[in-house]
Amino acid sequence: MKVAVLGAGAWGTALAGHLAARHDTLLWARDAALIAGLQARHENSRYLDGIALPDALRYDADLGAALAHGAADDALCVIAAPVAGLRTLCHAMRDAGCVPAHVVWVCKGFEADTHLLPHQVIAAELPEQQSNGVLSGPSFAREVGQSLPVALTVASVSAECRERTLAAFHHGAMRIYTGDDVVGVEVGGAVKNVLAIATGISDGLGLGLNARAALITRGLAEMSRLGVVLGGRAETFTGLTGLGDLILTATGDLSRNRTVGLQLAAGRTLNDILGALGHVAEGVRCAQAVLALARAQSIDMPITQAVCGVLFDGIAPRDAVSGLLRRDARAE
């Protein structure tokens, strides 16, 4: 199978390395200097340093060439750009005049200005693209790059897209499950990043494991409430792309969103934290979108509201926690 991966950040690079072990894989980035470094060293020293990439993996800064590779009869196109750049990439794909027949995206979050999920952005910008889906689940790029075991879910209403994605990714240490709840999978992948900031704050303040468990459990309830109202199925949120991804992102030290929370608890400013990270922390980007959607639907999401207060309203982390503890008692 031919596979084109669009986006050479940490996640796109790790997935391309996995795919290249079995398939004819081309990794694209618009940054010619990044591509030149990949070609010279077979390592993404900018985003995934220390991980050797397969010799068979090829690289290109020409979007047209990458799209042509991913548009072959027996091919798959993987969109690994962050949500913030998804619409721009779709524009470029359309302008290139070559939209692959089978597309799967791996980005997580809501578009900041429109509050749209990735599938809604793609439907608006590439309406002719019908065989598509989302690949998501509890996963750190570095561990995938190290070929450590991982389980992901592809969700699509297209059986052909599910089967093609399964054929591409299900090998080696990667196990793929299939489903059709695109909305549920996307909401889980977005909201868990916001909740991971909350658990990072709690852990950074030294509030203990009991508090962490409470935040994860009540955070899952927030995720499910929003997801069901937006069209997802309740059972999706207890699976890999909901609870599974939440547990990993909230507790794993490779989590950028958890790191943001830890650093906020230590008294650092958000600008300093993001500057030091040098990578995307999607929870920061989509927290306001999640809260706006919740308010528009009259959904109670107190943990998300507390995170937004710390990130954007100058509320001290310890005061945000105190506010949660002062909430009225209620039935679970």
From Swiss-Prot:
Its EC number is 1.1.1.94. Sn-glycerol 3-phosphate binds at residues 108, 137, 139, 192, 245, 255-257. Keywords: Cytoplasm, Lipid biosynthesis, Lipid metabolism, NAD, NADP, Nucleotide-binding, Oxidoreductase, Phospholipid biosynthesis, Phospholipid metabolism. One of its GO terms (molecular function) is NAD binding. This is Glycerol-3-phosphate dehydrogenase [NAD(P)+]. It is found in: Cytoplasm. PANTHER family: GLYCEROL-3-PHOSPHATE DEHYDROGENASE, GLYCEROL-3-PHOSPHATE DEHYDROGENASE [NAD(+)] 2, CHLOROPLASTIC. The active site is at residue 192. Pfam families: NAD_Gly3P_dh_C, NAD_Gly3P_dh_N. The keyword Lipid metabolism applies. The keyword Lyase does not apply. NADPH binds at residues 11, 30, 108, 141, 256, 280, 282. GO terms for cellular component: cytosol. It comes from Burkholderia orbicola (strain AU 1054). PROSITE patterns: NAD_G3PDH. Pathway: Membrane lipid metabolism; glycerophospholipid metabolism. Its main location: cytoplasm.
